[in-house]
Amino acid sequence: MVKVVIVNGRPGCGKTTFEQICQDICFPFTSHIGFSPDHSLAISLCSTVDFVKHIATLCGWDGTKSLENRRFLSDLKGLLTTWNDVPFKKIQERVEALMFDRKIDWILFVDCREPAEIQKLKERLNATTVLIRREEVEYDEVSNHSDADVFYYDYDLTIFNNSDIIHLEDEARKFIEYMKKEEVPHYVNAD
């Protein structure tokens, strides 16, 4: 079973930190996959811009996330989405690859910013949506519509990251326990 979790939040809100804490709670296996001690739950991380970043690197992008580079990545993702829905197809391929491991239940964290893309992932992959909020970054300057439109979606869950790492770890533990529940939506291949 694969439970897809769409994660969003403004730059610097702690999305990656939250995801990594969730991995650590489920026992770290590698930098991208975390298994629980009983080996019945695994966590994998990806983003709708992973493939976009690969293409950007081929075009000379140096991997930095300046305002100009964030705008470039956002625009490139928009082009790939309009052309052939490439970012969604790459996420769907990832989910279907995880479906082959029937001995383990997966939580796949997918970082995604655009409300329309979030809704598409939610509908097509039966995903749960999570917003990470951190007050100190909510009014920072952004360079692109993807970062600016973070709050224009009604998320299933909101996690507040306004305190210290211990508080965020507690929120991550609660989240993992919630995701273990059977009634949480999961992906079912239509084939």
Residue ranges and their predicted role:
Residues 11, 123-124, 128-191:
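Small-molecule kinase domains that catalyze NTP-dependent phosphoryl transfer to phosphate-bearing small molecules
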Residues 15:
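Conserved lysine of the Walker
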Residues 35-105, 113:
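ATP-dependent small-molecule kinase phosphotransfer cores
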Residues 18:
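Hydrophobic positions on the alpha1 helix immediately C-terminal to the Walker A/P-loop
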Residues 1-5, 43:
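Extreme N-terminal starter segment of soluble prokaryotic enzymes
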Residues 99, 119-123:
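Surface-exposed amphipathic alpha-helices with a cationic face
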Residues 7, 109:
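Hydrophobic anchor at the beta1->P-loop junction of P-loop NTPases
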